[in-house]
């Protein structure tokens, strides 16, 4: 990746991260980067969103059960 493309990617990720914070998604930069990469290779964004929600629900259930 050339320097200009790398800078554009960093700026795009920063913008997505800011939007994520405004929407209070709780997703960090790394997670957002992985989700963007998965979308770039053709995975359905709605399916990914559903998966993230399910994983959070499962995590909350596990945390509640352990406490």
UniProtKB/Swiss-Prot annotation:
Part of the gamma-tubulin complex. Interacts with GIP1 and GCP3. It comes from the Eukaryota. One of its GO terms (molecular function) is histone binding. Its main location: cytoplasm. Mostly expressed in siliques and flowers, and, to a lower extent, in leaves, roots and seedlings, with highest levels in young tissues, meristematic cells, and the vasculature. GO terms for biological process: CENP-A containing chromatin assembly; centromere complex assembly; gamma-tubulin complex localization; microtubule nucleation by microtubule organizing center. GO terms for cellular component: gamma-tubulin ring complex; microtubule; nuclear envelope; phragmoplast; spindle. It is found in: Cytoplasm, Cytoskeleton, Microtubule organizing center; Cytoplasm, Cytoskeleton, Spindle; Nucleus; Cytoplasm, Cytoskeleton, Phragmoplast. Required for gamma-tubulin complex recruitment to the microtubule organizing centers (MTOCs). During mitosis, modulates gamma-tubulin complex localization, spindle stability and chromosomal segregation. Necessary for gametophyte development and embryogenesis. Belongs to the MOZART1 family. PANTHER family: MITOTIC-SPINDLE ORGANIZING PROTEIN 1 (PTHR28520:SF2). Coiled coil: none annotated. Disruption phenotype: In the gip1 gip2 double mutants, embryonic lethality and impaired development of male gametophytes, severe growth defects and sterility, characterized by microtubule (MT) misorganization and abnormal spindle polarity, resulting in ploidy defects. Keywords: Cytoplasm, Cytoskeleton, Microtubule, Nucleus. This is Mitotic-spindle organizing protein 1A. InterPro entries: MZT1.
């Amino acid at each position: 990746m050339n320097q200009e493309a790398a800078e554009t990617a960093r700026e795009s990720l920063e913008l997505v991260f800011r939007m994520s914070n405004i929407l209070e998604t709780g997703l960090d930069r790394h997670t957002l980067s992985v989700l963007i990469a998965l979308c770039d290779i053709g995975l359905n964004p709605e399916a990914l969103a559903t998966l993230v929600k399910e994983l959070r629900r499962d995590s909350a259930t596990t945390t509640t059960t352990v406490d």
